[in-house]
Amino acid sequence: MLSGSAQLKLLQLVSPTLPVGAYNYSEGLEWLIERGNITNADTLGAWITQELCRGSITVDTAIMVRAHRLAGQMPKTDILPSPTLKHLSYWNQWLTATRESRELREQSLQMGGSLRKLLLDLEPTVQSWFEPIPPTEPCNYAIAFGLGAAFWGIDLHQSGLGYLHSWANNLISAGLRLIPLGQTAGQKLLLHLTPTILHQWQQILLLGDDDLYSCSWGLALASMGHESQYTRLFRS
């Protein structure tokens, strides 16, 4: 069970008000809604469920798990040993390379950079944990989240559920503004996704390094289409 302090820090880390810019991104939803592929709460829910089960969020969360595990065993006052430095750098570069569109890559790196800067402002001693990713190298959001959660003593299970829930919450928020839908419809959808989030989290924990893949061609096409969309409210 999380301590009271860790619980509060988890709530802070997954809060929609965390200044990392998540509200600026729809991950292709804006393009899909303009094309008429998503028109109501049911089609929005179907899209988010599909992404939860087969999309790139599965890979993102799996990389967050690896960052958390690598950092979670280290005392806060110690510099990470060279194997850990190497692995963190590898997974950060690997995740950047797997992005299927410019907007999705920029989203992950912008949010990751903002979270890294925020964590350094809040907890200067976390600097050593980010040592494998120098300030000149962009940091993916999944890496920064995993390191921050581990540093704050948030256990892996709660970190993973929080990561997935905040992702779903952000997409629902974007959908509410774009379709548009009422707030109650959004809350019903978020509640409906609870079993899927719980199930997918357990599946993610079972993924080995060779199992990391996603079938997200729909997301890739939507994101690429959004890059040339004439009128846009969101950055992805």
Curated annotation (Swiss-Prot):
Pfam families documented for this protein: UreF
Q: Does the keyword Cytoplasm apply?
A: yes
Q: Name one GO molecular function term.
A: nickel cation binding
- Gene3D superfamilies cross-referenced by the UniProt entry: Urease accessory protein UreF
Tell where it localizes: Cytoplasm
Major place of localization? cytoplasm
Q: Which family does it belong to?
A: Belongs to the UreF family.
Q: Which PANTHER family match?
A: UREASE ACCESSORY PROTEIN F
Can you say what this protein is called? Urease accessory protein UreF
Q: Which gene encodes it?
A: ureF
